[in-house]
Regions:
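Conserved catalytic submotifs in the C-terminal HATPase_c
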Residues: 203-206, 225, 230-240, 277
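Short helix N-cap motif at coil->helix boundaries in the Bergerat
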Residues: 209, 298-306
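Sensory modules in modular signal-transduction proteins
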Residues: 1-33
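A conserved beta-strand-to-alpha-helix junction within the catalytic ATP-binding
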Residues: 203-218
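Conserved micro-motifs of the catalytic ATP-binding
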Residues: 197-202, 241-244
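Short alpha-helical segment of the dimerization/phosphotransfer core of two-component systems
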Residues: 177-182
Length: 366
């Protein structure tokens, strides 16, 4: 293969690519490679560019199979018609560790053997795998705690408390609470899974967001009143047209208002404020904003970026005491994302919190 053609093809590729000659020196590198590994890569020994023994061994094997000690055992053979190796490794790139999928392939050249090294960033895959591991671990923990308690109470009921009606009633009440907690968790997990699976499909139903918000406020008014909290809806006396999934948007505002009553009810009032936005830059057009405001104790700023993570809680014990699963705001985030909207969270300790959902404005009436 002609040198000029190789350099031209490598330069056009979007992923980092290096070409190594028979002397194990880099003779071509594209812009993506220099951005990842540093400037002035050409004419350098390959071992000084990518210091990973498995990759270096694969390059040596393809350049000179007869003199190489052995093929790298921890790389998968194949991946190119001319023969090669593939492996997922962690490389050092500009002072940081980067999980990468490396493909090393033979590159026939007019002046002798050469090797092509392709580097694909796999950090996204690694992050997804780790997120899945964390998710499974969190679910296991959340289910194990009430299950362990219930098993303990069952053993007690079969033993010391068998003939104690008062203890039996007390333990059965606790078991009912723990079972309800597990049921809420399972329902939220199913809801989150369903929302995530639908996130790429934008809903097209036309509805009146103002009417929906007022219905949520009415539904939760008795629960709030029992806790000494008043729910008040402000703004937008007329129609508030949006395109959306009525059930999912009801779930969004139900979660937000319920949280405001539970955690911010000390202020005695929760306000739902509906406002029109003439033009939202990120949504590229008119929008509607619904702010759920409480006058409670507020949330420290360091927690705000993580509130929509699965199972993230500001206060684990308090959340569990109030029946929280740690999934409500994650569900809210995904539903709002499906509606091509955004969620804004503002809070100051001692001053309350404001959760604002901003959705693109629809046309016509709901």
């Amino acid at each position: 293969m002609d040198l000029g053609l190789v350099q031209q093809v490598i330069a056009a590729l979007p992923v980092p690519v290096l070409a190594v000659d028979a002397e194990a020196r880099v003779f071509a590198a594209n812009r993506a490679a220099t951005g990842l590994l540093g400037d002035r890569l050409t004419d350098r020994p390959f071992v000084t560019v990518l210091r990973h023994p498995t990759i270096v061994q694969a390059v040596d094997t393809l350049l000179d199979p007869a003199q190489s000690a052995a093929a790298p055992s921890d790389m998968t053979q194949g991946g190119a018609e001319a023969g090669g190796y593939r492996s997922r490794v962690v490389i050092s790139a500009r002072g940081r560790d980067l999980p990468a999928e490396i493909t090393v392939s033979a590159l026939p050249m007019q002046n002798g053997p050469a090797v092509l090294v392709v580097i694909e960033d796999s950090s996204g895959i690694e992050e997804a795998v780790q997120l899945r591991r964390d998710f499974v671990a969190n679910v296991s923990h959340e289910l194990r705690t009430p299950l362990t308690a219930m098993i303990g109470f069952i053993e007690t009921l079969r033993g010391p408390a068998r003939d104690d009606p008062a203890a039996r009633d007390r333990f059965l009440s606790i078991m009912e609470t723990e079972a309800a907690r597990m049921n809420r968790l399972v329902l939220d997990l199913l809801s989150l899974s369903r929302v995530e699976s639908e996130e790429r499909r934008r809903p097209s139903e036309r509805l009146d967001l103002g009417r929906l918000v007022r219905a949520v406020a009415e539904t939760l008014s008795q629960t709030a009143h029992a806790q000494g909290v008043t729910i008040r809806v402000e703004g937008a006396d007329g129609p508030v047209p949006v395109e959306g999934d009525a059930d999912q948007l009801t779930q969004v505002f139900h979660n937000l208002v319920e949280n405001a009553v539970k955690y911010g009810g000390a202020g005695g009032e929760v306000i739902l404020r509906i406002a029109a936005i003439a033009h939202d830059a990120s949504l590229r057009g008119p929008a509607w904003a619904v702010a759920v405001i409480d006058r409670g104790e507020g949330i420290d700023e360091r927690h705000l970026p993580r509130l929509t993570e699965r199972f993230y809680r500001v206060d684990d014990d308090r959340s569990r005491q109030k029946g929280g699963t740690g999934l409500g705001l994650a569900i809210v985030k995904h539903i709002v994302s499906r509606h091509r909207g955004k969620l804004r969270i503002e809070s100051q300790p001692g001053e309350g919190s404001c959760f604002t959902v901003i959705l693109p404005a629809g046309s016509g009436r709901g």
